[in-house]
Amino acid sequence: MKKVTAMLFSMAVGLNAVSMAAKAKASEEQETDVLLIGGGIMSATLGTYLRELEPEWSMTMVERLEGVAQESSNGWNNAGTGHSALMELNYTPQNADGSISIEKAVAINEAFQISRQFWAHQVERGVLRTPRSFINTVPHMSFVWGEDNVNFLRARYAALQQSSLFRGMRYSEDHAQIKEWAPLVMEGRDPQQKVAATRTEIGTDVNYGEITRQLIASLQKKSNFSLQLSSEVRALKRNDDNTWTVTVADLKNGTAQNIRAKFVFIGAGGAALKLLQESGIPEAKDYAGFPVGGQFLVSENPDVVNHHLAKVYGKASVGAPPMSVPHIDTRVLDGKRVVLFGPFATFSTKFLKNGSLWDLMSSTTTSNVMPMMHVGLDNFDLVKYLVSQVMLSEEDRFEALKEYYPQAKKEDWRLWQAGQRVQIIKRDAEKGGVLRLGTEVVSDQQGTIAALLGASPGASTAAPIMLNLLEKVFGDRVSSPQWQATLKAIVPSYGRKLNGDVAATERELQYTSEVLGLNYDKPQAADSTPKPQLKPQPVQKEVADIAL
């Protein structure tokens, strides 16, 4: 009995010691100018901007996992597409009169040009090294079948020729030509099937995880930058002087510390919403989140991989979210080519792949529960789509693959669970709540804290998204001559549009291609194509989009 009592006493003393150590550690306050929460591409990009704009500012980055770029930025957890609307048909919706709207496509392409310039600048500075390790030329293709879809693609191609950003795109309805572009897609296909494709040679495959690792490795070379891994934010509290005290737990030894920061960026992917809510700023009350995961079929068989060099996107079926369309993609991951097909939607209440099953429930509040209910009621087709995706069998997924690769063999493919994407639900005065595709920077009025919510186009537009954040929270500094000069050195086209300026477009594409080691030839005259037959479109209920 005495031994048991002694043992219990020793355990109590030990636990008390750990608790006291944690409190003591928490009382030791670390000070920093900028706190970056999350070790993904958004935090890495913002940190890289600020390092060049204000090299004397101290920065601290905290990451919950044991390494950076292990969640959504990880190359295996996303599609690795340099989203520039060259092939993604959801960025060019069809109007009621049958015409094609290209405004969104132009905006997406402009944004990706900023990312290309940002990365090229970092290569020139030696921050990013060996461009082939993170970006490679992979042609981007759109591929459709059926008379209505062919007519849509024909009209899309014609509309995009109005923009200097889409020069060099080619169009074909010829089976032999499309087979030359994408053999896997055409071999074994019915020769009588009506098909069409566009192809743009300057498309890219991007390893965002590698970019993130290299950017953070460069930041770590400076003494006023600190990276803390296995560190989870437990509390955020605004101080009277508008600084923030952030409590961070060390997940390895159980201790905690307080970090006092002048500015806090929440770039924690799916976890950003909960942390934004934890901050208590009123702007957070407008938002809720709904998690959707994605799966891909993966082939590493050389007979498959070496027979396909393209990212091929199709058109979503009627009633399905526009971004849900499957695509068969060449990827370059860790120096090795693979082919991915998907995505297939999955559901989990986790907000992160390495998150908690309680994430959805714990982020639901009295402020956002009604917007969530409105979104569910207003988008029943989306709910049905997600349920149908979750119910897919192995055979169902393989049949979907065969629509894009008719001669596919089951033994060449395995299923891979990619990352989680938290869709933005925002309070709306008219509808109660709306599902928002895209990313959104949410900040307080004082510009002392900001969070990035949303999922698409995400990593491919990290550079322009963080530019937007700088303008939103550091407006006075951004307008200063010093910051203006630095930003224009980082992004030569900063402050002006490339669209409509052929010379400027070609100059920037030539520059970034040379620095990043990408293929680029001056575009030739556009292909002659049959004139699109614009047909009035039946009025259809708008389908909410989601990012997979």
UniProtKB/Swiss-Prot annotation:
Record-stated family: Belongs to the MQO family.
Cellular component GO terms, alphabetical: cytoplasm; cytoplasmic side of plasma membrane; cytosol
CC cofactor: FAD
UniProt keyword annotation of Oxidoreductase present: yes
Catalytic activity: (S)-malate + a quinone = a quinol + oxaloacetate
Segments of skewed composition (Low complexity): 530-541
Annotated protein name in UniProt: Malate:quinone oxidoreductase
Top-level EC class as recorded in UniProt: oxidoreductase
Pathway: Carbohydrate metabolism; tricarboxylic acid cycle; oxaloacetate from (S)-malate (quinone route): step 1/1
Gene3D superfamilies, per database record: D-Amino Acid Oxidase, subunit A, domain 2, FAD/NAD(P)-binding domain
